């Protein structure tokens, strides 16, 4: 009947609209995924530091409105220059990759890991107070120390990291918190490396 075919046409049109909507949503999803992908450091798969200011501004706003804690870890590969000089840049890249994997494995899915410098990573630990951040940092340091990084044409190398830890204590400027984590890292290196220091 004509009523039946009209109903069928309406159903097909509705289905077509739904398919178009799903295609649009999938397109948006792939676009978002691609922008995150473009925001990653190609070697270590960690986030590019250009996204750090925006992320910290958002996290600082959450800290202020919800009174939730926030901690940062500044992680630096010890004696990285001598690894590069002794075994070559390819070996240095392998070490950085393995350290980055270990950092990513040691934190939660809700945390953020940035490639901050040549051999430096900055970890944003959301909703994490000082004591909990210290446990995470110590676990990370220990995991890296246990690694044996295989290199082409050379025996596996042992790697260590120094870590500076700072927890947000009310100062409104994110850079102030980064500087505190950096100062703690400097102290960790000055005290002999392969350790965690808090400010």
Name each model-derived stretch:
Residues 44, 73-76, 118, 181:
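Conserved metal-coordinating catalytic motifs of nucleotidyl cyclase and c-di-GMP turnover enzymes
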Residues 105-110, 142-154, 167, 187:
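Short catalytic/binding micro-motifs of nucleotide second-messenger systems
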Residues 36-54, 75-89, 97:
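Conserved nucleotide-binding and Mg2+-coordinating catalytic segments in signaling enzymes
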Residues 3-46, 50-62, 67-69, 111-112, ...:
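Signal-transducing coiled-coil linker helices
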Residues 115, 133, 144-161:
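Catalytic core regions of nucleotide second-messenger enzymes
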Residues 134, 166-199:
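Catalytic-core segments of nucleotide cyclases and related cyclic-nucleotide turnover enzymes
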């Amino acid at each position: 009947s004509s009523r039946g075919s009209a109903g069928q046409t309406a159903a097909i049109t509705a289905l077509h609209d739904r398919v178009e909507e799903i295609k649009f949503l999938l397109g948006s999803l792939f676009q978002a995924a691609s922008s995150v992908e473009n925001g990653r450091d190609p070697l270590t798969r960690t986030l590019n530091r250009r996204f750090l200011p925006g992320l910290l501004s958002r996290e600082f706003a959450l800290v202020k409105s919800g009174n939730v804690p926030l901690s940062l870890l500044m992680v630096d590969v010890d004696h990285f220059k001598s690894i590069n000089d002794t075994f070559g840049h390819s070996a240095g890249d392998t070490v950085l990759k393995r350290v980055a994997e270990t950092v990513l494995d040691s934190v939660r899915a809700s945390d953020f890991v940035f490639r901050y410098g040549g051999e430096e990573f900055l970890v944003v630990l959301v909703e994490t107070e000082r004591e909990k951040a210290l446990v995470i940092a110590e676990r990370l340091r220990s995991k890296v120390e246990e690694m044996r990084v295989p290199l082409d044409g050379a025996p596996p190398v042992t790697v260590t990291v120094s870590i500076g830890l700072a927890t947000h204590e009310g100062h409104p400027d994110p850079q102030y918190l980064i500087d505190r984590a950096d100062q703690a890292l400097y102290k960790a290196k000055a005290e002999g490396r392969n350790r965690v220091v808090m400010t």
